[in-house]
A protein has these predicted regions:
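C-terminal helical cap(s) of enzyme catalytic domains, especially alpha/beta-barrels
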Residues: 244-250, 265-301
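Active-site mouth loops of central-metabolism enzymes
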Residues: 22-47, 99, 172-179
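Acidic (Asp/Glu)-rich catalytic clusters
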Residues: 50-57, 82-87, 146-152, 221-224, ...
Length: 302
């Protein structure tokens, strides 16, 4: 049995609107109001958050788009963030929602999870531990990822039932089998993960299932016993501990709960200044952890 402090949230590191003015001023003075300056500010912000959270939060989920908008400089900040988080022992999930087939998907998998061959040298391009993906193209889009998950001990999270308000327009549609699209996608995740099982009964193929639909979350936990859940929607999107508790199995395993703005902008709720963002983030992460643990109890590894 281990202590439930390993239950934690992810922080989704986003764009420079969340970065305190003091950090932006420092970076803009050095690099100017340029893409390089913005990227430097992002990385400084990220480092401070990681330093404040790495011992209580198991994973970090940088959203690739908020780095790509700053060009190659932003992409470098993403690489640096991944490397720094991993140096602190954190599990890194790149939120890229990649979606393609064949050799193109293999290239995405190699870039984010695998090793790139450069004239016979094997080099990590991004080096994340897991990647969010869209499974709409079917098995052709998942096979290249599964291959690298197997060879390099990596993971993927397939979009199944997402937390956005319009997700039901497609995901809730009923098929001829009377199951919904999201239920069928979940079933496919179970199948894709059959040969990628870990020692605690979960596969390398996970599912994104939103906290904003708690009833479906509980149903999917029962139907997908070997699929690890990434659960967005906690905090700023309205989800709470009661909404996410059904994502976990009877041993308190099987899910990681995502909080982004709720952690990054916690200083606003706590009546602090933006320069206290790291202290506030830690306090909020501890509160969130304790709230979730209060619902699910201690984690048990049998």
């Amino acid at each position: 049995e281990i202590m439930p402090s390993l239950v934690g949230s992810e922080m989704c590191i986003r764009d420079s609107d969340y970065v305190p003015e003091s950090i932006k001023t420092k970076c803009f003075e050095k690099y100017g109001k340029t893409l390089e300056g913005a990227a430097a500010a992002l990385f400084e912000f990220n480092k401070a958050l990681i330093d404040a959270l790495y011992d209580i939060v198991p994973a970090v989920k940088p959203q690739a788009a908020y780095y790509e908008m700053y060009g190659w400089q932003g992409v470098k900040a993403l690489c640096d963030t991944i490397a720094y988080a991993k140096s602190k022992g954190m599990f890194v999930i790149t939120d890229g929602k990649r979606n393609d087939i064949g050799t193109t998907m293999e290239a995405y998998a190699t870039a984010h999870l695998g090793h790139t061959d450069v004239a016979g040298e094997s080099i990590d391009a991004f080096g994340a531990d897991a990647l969010t993906v869209n499974g709409y193209l079917g098995t052709d889009g998942i096979k290249p990822l599964a291959k690298i998950c197997d060879s390099d001990d990596k993971g993927i999270f397939v979009l199944v039932k997402t937390s956005n308000p319009s997700s039901g327009e497609l995901q809730d549609m009923k098929l001829e089998t009377n199951e919904s699209v999201y239920e069928h996608m979940g079933k496919m995740c179970e199948g894709w993960g059959e040969d990628l099982m870990g020692k605690h009964g979960y596969s390398a193929v996970g599912a994104v299932v939103g906290a904003t639909y708690p009833e479906q979350l509980g149903e999917m936990r029962a139907k997908l016993p070997h699929t690890f859940f990434l659960v967005p929607g906690y905090g700023a999107q309205g989800g709470g501990a009661d909404d996410v508790k059904n994502a976990f199995d009877e041993n308190g395993l099987g899910a990681i709960i995502n909080s982004s703005r709720g952690i990054m902008c916690a200083w606003k709720k706590q009546g602090l200044t933006e320069d206290d963002f790291a202290v506030a983030a830690r306090k909020e992460a501890e509160r969130m952890r304790d709230e979730i643990v209060g619902c699910i109890g201690k984690i048990k590894l049998g």
